[in-house]
C-alpha cells in the first residue's frame, strides 16, 4: 500500500510540473473523446481525480503557486488548518477550491493587519501585499538589523526578482520568495503592478512615522520598503534601497561612520564626473565666467575651495594658452581636506598641472593648503597681491553648503572672500532644499531630487548617443563608473536622511536661497552670457541620453536639469562697489 501511495504521489507531481495534456501510452487515452462525460478536462489530472479543464491550467497553476507560497509562510503563524500536511481529496472544482483557499487566507491576513495596525496610510487602492506581523522582536538592535534592507537590490540581479506565472507550467518551489523570518516579515506579492506606487507611499509613511517618533511603526514600514524595493527594477529600486538604508540607520540609531570621509568621496566623485555631465557642466560654466573676468589681465590667480583631483583646470589653462596676445601668468591655490594616510595629495595634483602648463607654454605657480573646513582657513596665508597687478577669482563647486552645518561658518567665509576682493566668485550648488528644519519636508524633497538624479544616471548608462551636431558621441558609460556614481549619490542620501547636527553636512539649498544670502552679504550677480549657454548646450550632445538634459537660463544664472527638473545651478558674483577692504588689507 505504501508503495502504491508513493507511486500515486509521483504521478501527481509529474502532472503538476508538466501542466499540459500528456501523450500517454495507456489504453485509457484510446477511448473515444465523444463518449467521455467530462470532455475538455485535463486527462492526466482526471486520472488522479481532479477535474480541471485544459484551458484553465494556466490560471490554476498561478493560483496553486500563490497558495503554496501562502501556505509555506503561514505555518509559523499558527494557522493550523492551512498546514501543508492537510490532505484535500478530489475536489470537484479544483480552480474554485484553490480560489476559496486564497480568499480564506486573504481574510485571515486582513484581520491580522487590522489587529496589528501596520497598514500603510494613504494607499486607497486594494492592497497588493499580504503581510504577517511578528509577535516578538529582539530587545537589542545592531548592524545585523540592517539585513532587512536587501543590499543586492542595488544591482540588477535576476535572482532577486519575483515572477508571475504566465504559462501553463509552474514551479513547485518558491525559493526566490523565501526570506529569513528573523530578519523580515514574510510577504506575498499578489499584484506587482501597484508595487511601485505602494513603495513610494511606504517610504513617505515611514518618514512620517520617524517624524512623529513612532519608531515601532517605522521599523515595520522600513522592512516593507526593503522587500518592495526588490520587486522593482532600474532607478526606482536603487534609489528606494538607499533611502531604506538611510531610514533604517536613523530608526536603529546606527549612524554611518565617517560617512563623508574626504578621500573616498573624492574617488567616488571622479566616477561621477565620468558618468554624467553634471560636474563637467559645473566646471565648464564656471571656467567661462572666470575666463571672461580675466580678459586683459596679465597675471591671474584662482583660489579653488575644492581642488580635489584638479579636473577643472586643464581646460581653463588651455583656453588661457590660446588667448590672443599670449597667456597670462597663472597662479592656482588649491584647498583640500587632510588625507587619512597623511599623503600630500594637493601637491601631487599641482605637479601634474605644472607638467601640463609647461607643455602648453603657460607660466604656472601652485600652492596647496590643507583645512578640515573652509571656516578654519586663515585668509592671510593665501598671499593675496594687489588687484592692480593680479586678478583674483574664487571658485567653489559643491562646497559652500557644507558650511551650513556649523553656526556662523558661512558668514565667516563670505566675509573672508570680501577681504580678498576678487574680480569674480563662481558658485555651483545642487538645486534642492535639503536643509529644511522639519525632517519630513527634507525627506520628501530629497526623495524627489535623487529619484530624478538616479533616473538620469540610468539613462546615461543605457547607451551611447549620436550627436546631431557632428560631435563625436560619448562612449558607453563604464559599468564601474555607473555603480560608483550611484554609491556617491547614495552616501549623500544617507547623510541627508540619517544624520543630524554637525554630522549632516549635505545641506543643499536652492539658487534663490543662495541669491538672498549672497546679496545680503554684499555681492552682486554677474550675468553668465549667451555664449556660455550655447556652449553648455553643445556639451550635452556628448552624453548618452542627452535629449533628457536641459540647460536653463535663470536671471543670469545657468541651471542643468533632467527633463523639467533643475538639478544643479551655476552663478557668478562680484563685490558691490562699497564692499570689501581691497587687496593688501586681508583680515578675518
UniProtKB/Swiss-Prot annotation:
Residues 197-251 are annotated as: Leucine repeat I (LRI). The keyword Protein transport does not apply. Residues 498-574 are annotated as: SAW. Its main location: nucleus. A motif (VHIID) lies at residues 300-304. Keywords: Gibberellin signaling pathway, Nucleus, Phosphoprotein, Repressor, Transcription, Transcription regulation, Ubl conjugation. Residues 1-38, 152-177 are annotated as: Disordered. Residues 348-380 are annotated as: Leucine repeat II (LRII). GO terms for molecular function: DNA-binding transcription factor activity; sequence-specific DNA binding. A motif (DELLA motif) lies at residues 42-46. GO terms for biological process: gibberellic acid mediated signaling pathway; hyperosmotic salinity response; jasmonic acid mediated signaling pathway; negative regulation of gibberellic acid mediated signaling pathway; negative regulation of seed germination; regulation of DNA-templated transcription; regulation of reactive oxygen species metabolic process; regulation of seed dormancy process. GO terms for cellular component: nucleus. Pfam families: DELLA, GRAS. InterPro entries: DELLA_N_sf (IPR038088), TF_DELLA_N (IPR021914), TF_GRAS (IPR005202). Residues 190-574 form the GRAS domain. Residues 269-334 are annotated as: VHIID. Residues 166-177 have a biased composition (Low complexity). It is found in: Nucleus. A motif (LXXLL motif) lies at residues 400-404. It comes from the Eukaryota. The DELLA motif is required for its GA-induced degradation. Probable transcriptional regulator that acts as a repressor of the gibberellin (GA) signaling pathway. Probably acts by participating in large multiprotein complexes that repress transcription of GA-inducible genes. Upon GA application, it is degraded by the proteasome, allowing the GA signaling pathway. Its degradation is not essential for germination. This is DELLA protein GAI. It comes from Solanum lycopersicum (Tomato). The lineage of its organism: Eukaryota, Viridiplantae, Streptophyta, Embryophyta, Tracheophyta. The gene is GAI.
